[in-house]
Amino acid sequence: MKIYLVGGAVRDRLLQRPAGDRDWVVVGATPAQMEAQGYSAVGRDFPVFLHPKTGEEYALARTERKSGRGYRGFVVDADPAVTLEEDLQRRDFTINAIACDEDTGTLVDPYGGVRDIEQRVLRHVGPAFVEDPLRVLRAARFMAHFAPLDFTVAPETMDLMRNVAASGELDALVPERVWQELRKALVSAQPSAFLRTLHDAHALGPILPELEALYGVPQRAEFHPEVDTGIHQEMVSDMAAKLAPGDDLVGFAALTHDLGKGLTPPEEWPRHIMHEQRGIKPLKELCARLRVPTEHQQLAEAVCREHLNVHRIDELRDATVLELLGRCDALRRPERVARIALCCEADKRGRLGFEDSDYPQGETLKRLHQAALSVQARDLDTTHLKGPAIGEALAKARVKAIAAAR
């Protein structure tokens, strides 16, 4: 029996980045031997065990053979005769196919992962890459994760990704996995790299057609010097990651705020009148398909519908501001307002040449929201009021408070 550290922990060590969970591979062992040494079996699809003291995962070396469609269609062989090199060969990218003997510090790198780390290249291990469509998504997510290090996708790997997209295999991805990869990308350093990689691989359309529809759609250059709505979508996602690092609620709402522009009739380009209303339908469809959590969907719908109103909040009547807050459910969910403000700021600054601009509208929205929130029904004299009249009096008092806070 021989144990090696593998995967992301080795990769991140070589990149001099903080490592996450450590994964181990065990060569030359059987499940019975692992359990005899106190390891607990937890793997459902293949033999994985938890260390009796550290709780870290130890997987028996295995090979995988394609047996059906999608990323679940594999036959696993975890025979003790499976070698370390065979186990590493089934992995997705060379940078993840490096093992380390922790006793000696010796690296086992049969597929050139160390070289690719040095050259900042994301490269597939072998032709079996095309057997698992999830790897296309993982490639895009890795590009977003490692964007600050200037990684590129190897041309031959991009060719294989396009082959997977053309094969129809991406249709076999289960919604939860697509959402999981998207969610990770949204909190990465540069979510745009996720979008751009999938777009270049012709995979964004099959996976996220609502986002692919924005590429090539022009906007008015005086407001959007970047012109292409797809590029604007990338810039907004990156700005959201900068303004709200680690917040996938903000990331998702910012990403999807302009979906309506993908439905603008070409004869109306580059104007997109009413795109904020048109965007709700494709947003609902995307959320239903990916089974997006309700909290994410509600925030995204609020930002999609109201971002133009927030941009011009100084021009809105006081009563209209209260109506806006009501549509966003901000009086019952006050924590939502700060996120809406961040999303709208990301939209405004996610434009070529506007990256460093101020966005006072965000502070105005929060200030007026606090003013409205400071007035509660219990603060009013409702002695002679009944039913709807109480609500009307509360609304009038809140409008007055908003006016005073201007």
From Swiss-Prot:
Species annotation: Stenotrophomonas maltophilia (strain R551-3)
Known EC number: 2.7.7.72, 3.1.3.-, 3.1.4.-
Keywords: ATP-binding, Hydrolase, Magnesium, Metal-binding, Multifunctional enzyme, Nickel, Nucleotide-binding, Nucleotidyltransferase, RNA repair, RNA-binding, Transferase, tRNA processing
Keyword Transferase: yes
Highest taxon of source: Bacteria
Domain notes: Comprises two domains: an N-terminal domain containing the nucleotidyltransferase activity and a C-terminal HD domain associated with both phosphodiesterase and phosphatase activities.
HD domain boundaries: 229-331
Cofactor: Mg(2+); Ni(2+)
Family: Belongs to the tRNA nucleotidyltransferase/poly(A) polymerase family. Bacterial CCA-adding enzyme type 1 subfamily.
This protein's encoding gene: cca
The protein's name: Multifunctional CCA protein
Protein residues bound to CTP: G8, R11, R91, R138, R141
Pfam families: HD (PF01966), PolyA_pol (PF01743), PolyA_pol_RNAbd (PF12627)
